[in-house]
Each structure stands twice: as C-alpha cells, then as structure tokens.
C-alpha cells in the first residue's frame, strides 16, 4: 500500500478551534473574578439570575477575544507565542472571527440587560469596546503604556458581577477593579522580559522594546510596591477580613521578594538561566490574583457562620 501525504490543504475549523478563538484561558479569569464580584455583593441573588449573568459576562469576554484575534491577526502571525491561534494559523478566517465577535458582543450585552439590569449591560458593553477598540486598535500598537491603561479592560469583570447583583458600584467593587488594574503591569512586564524578541519582531511597543529590560525591571518593582499596600488595604473593606489579610500579607511579601530579585538581576544572569526568575514571577502572578479573589470569596462564605469579616 502506498502512503500518500497530502499537503497544502488548509485544516477545517472544528469546535475546539472556535473555542480557542474566544481565548478560554483569559475567559476563565474573567469568569472567576466576575463570579466573586457577584457572590460577595451584600444582596441575595436568585441562582438562575446569577448563572445567567455569569454566562453572558463569559460570552462578552469571548467576544472580546475574537475581536482582538481578528484585529491582531498580522502581529499574531509573527509572534511565536500566538502564531498557532485559529486566525493567524489560517484555520478561522479573519472575517469569520469578526462576525463571531460582533454577534456574540450583541447577544451578550442585550441578554445581560434583559436578564439582570441595564447598568451591568452598559458596563459590559463599555468593557468590550475598551478592550477591542481602545486597547487592541489603539494603545497596544502606539504606546509602551499599553498594558497600564489597557489593563482597565481586564479589571472591569468583578465590577460587572457586582453590578449584576446590586445594579450599581461600591467601594468594594472599585477595590476589586483597582486590584486587577494594578496587578496587570507587573504581570505582563514580567512576561515581556523573556518574550522581548516576540514583541520586537511584531512591532509591538512593549516597554522592553522601547526602553529596554533594565527600565522594565524597575517598573516591575515600582508597580509591585504600589500593588502590595493596595492589596493589603482590601482587608479593611466590607469584603475583607482576617483570612484575606493573612493571605494578602503572605502573597504580597512573596510578590515584593520576587520583584526585588527581578530588579537586581542583570542580563547576563537572566540569559544564563534562561530567565528562570522572570518566568517564575510571571507564573506566581497568576496564582497571586486567583488566591486574592479566592480569599475574598472565602470571607463571604464564612460570614453566615460568624467567621468571615471583622
């Protein structure tokens, strides 16, 4: 029997490719923080409304991912980290990604408004617009402060979850927004330290590309120094408590140790161990955010038993 290999035929998009188009890893963080915002709000929400609200917030996050992948197809194709995504790899056509992103955006916003309230829907619509237009189409390609300002897009989900429950904004929801907003720069700059060539090849003006790794290391430290007291201060809001305080103190102590280590390293050290410290800091920063929000959720879960909060 002759083994015939056919090449040059594009792969047909499958279910998994369309799921990947929605950036499920990013969506998981959005869903979790939105869920925490919803569950810790000081009101009782019907389980069906809560489930529906989270579903359409997730759909809105997926829509943002699809729109971002449509717009960034040219630079995603160049970057090693992103070239295998459905659009740059040619599995999903850019026009198809755009259509899916727009359709899901409309469905998510309208249905969230009908199922919960107009304020939450308006906040979701603004978040999609901010991520797809303000960040993806403008900031990402024009300024090294792209992830500082653009980080607001990823910080809105807990505010949307809170708004689903309460119909408004509070000090607590603003704190959750601020926590993610201040976490975003050191998280992504630590990634940029060991992925500099990817951003440079694609022409993305990340801080490592425009100002170099030395300046970026200093920025990681400065933003970590700003983030740590903010995170600890959350213990003294209506969603904080002793468990959150202990968690925040431990995590932010570790954060500052890691940030100082990054700041003190020179390029010879980093290249010698293939950016081991920077990669470790990046991975830790993911756990950092999940554990902070997990502690917030735990405080709320313990309150009915007289154990959560102060």
From Swiss-Prot:
Subcellular location(s) of the protein: Cell inner membrane
More details: Carbon 2 of the heme B porphyrin ring is defined according to the Fischer nomenclature.
Alphabetically ordered keywords of this record: Cell inner membrane, Cell membrane, Heme biosynthesis, Membrane, Transferase, Transmembrane, Transmembrane helix
GO cellular component, one term: plasma membrane
Record's subunit section: Interacts with CtaA.
Entry EC number(s): 2.5.1.141
Catalytic activity: heme b + (2E,6E)-farnesyl diphosphate + H2O = Fe(II)-heme o + diphosphate
Membrane topology according to the record: Multi-pass membrane protein
Disulfide bonds: none
Similarity-based family: Belongs to the UbiA prenyltransferase family. Protoheme IX farnesyltransferase subfamily.
Example GO BP: heme O biosynthetic process
Pathway, per record: Porphyrin-containing compound metabolism; heme O biosynthesis; heme O from protoheme: step 1/1
UniProt protein name: Protoheme IX farnesyltransferase
Annotated organism of origin: Cereibacter sphaeroides (strain KD131 / KCTC 12085)
Coiled coil: none
